[in-house]
Regions:
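Bacterial N-terminal signal peptides that target proteins for export
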Residues: 1-8
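Bacterial extracytoplasmic/cell-wall-associated proteins, especially those involved in peptidoglycan
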Residues: 4, 22-25, 54-206
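Hydrophobic helical h-region of N-terminal Sec-dependent signal peptides
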Residues: 9-13
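N-terminal signal peptide c-region/cleavage motif recognized by signal peptidases
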Residues: 14-21
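Charged, low-complexity intrinsically disordered regions
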Residues: 19, 36-39, 48
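Short N-terminal segments immediately surrounding and downstream of signal-peptide cleavage
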Residues: 24-40
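N-terminal Sec/ER secretory leader and immediately downstream segment
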Residues: 43-49, 55
């Protein structure tokens, strides 16, 4: 390579890296804003006339959020992705998709909180957690980046409402290895992968 070409490349490289570093937080912030709008659209689905317009999240936008699985749990995409990662840890893709169905079913139900983060953290203050990973006393940071990338892609599709609800409107689920007493009072809607799914007979939140 000619000397002058090498000098040009060396000069351009820091600029390219600097531009990427500057763009990444902007892309992440924009993606989080999109996820919040999509979250609100799901929460307001019982009143479609008032539901906000929301552009879908792209794959690259979703992957820009919480890339290492270490970020605070304070935005819709991170809270949903981390829930799918931990609740379905060791399971198949269908397990993650089904857990996402339950989170969004709750988000769109008047008896549950109005944000994804509030849904997945519900119960941590006064009663047993609705989602066990949130208060099991273990670190919440991701251990497998590739699997977390899959979880984020499923979370993206869920927030975009691109996943068909295969749980039959379930609001609750448990692992096949468990036999919780509460399940006796509910209607089992379906079995998917590692989980059994339920909804209350009167569709009221418990």
């Amino acid at each position: 390579m000619p000397l002058n070409a090498r000098i040009i490349c060396c000069c351009l490289l820091p600029l390219t890296v600097s531009a990427w570093a500057a763009e990444s937080p902007a892309v992440r912030a924009a993606a989080e804003d999109k996820a919040q709008a999509l979250e609100q659209k799901v929460a307001d689905q019982q009143s479609p006339k008032t539901a906000p317009q929301a552009a879908p999240l792209s794959k690259s936008e979703a992957q820009a959020v919480d890339p290492a699985g270490q970020a605070p749990l304070d935005d819709a995409l991170t809270c949903l992705s981390r829930t799918l990662y931990w609740e379905a840890k060791g399971g198949e893709t269908e397990d993650m998709e089904a857990v996402a169905d339950v989170v969004l079913n709750r988000l769109g139900h008047e008896g549950f909180p109005g944000t994804v983060c509030e849904v997945v953290k519900q119960g941590s203050q006064k009663s047993p957690c609705q989602f066990s990973w949130w208060c099991d006393g273990r670190p919440d940071q991701v251990e497998e980046e590739q699997r977390y990338s899959v979880a984020k892609e499923i979370a993206r599709k869920a927030l975009n409402q691109q996943l068909k609800d295969r749980t039959g409107g379930a609001l609750y689920f448990h692992d096949r290895s468990a036999s919780p007493d509460w399940a006796r009072a509910y209607i089992k809607t379906v079995e998917i992968g590692s989980f059994l799914f339920y909804r209350p007979k009167d569709l009221a939140a418990r």
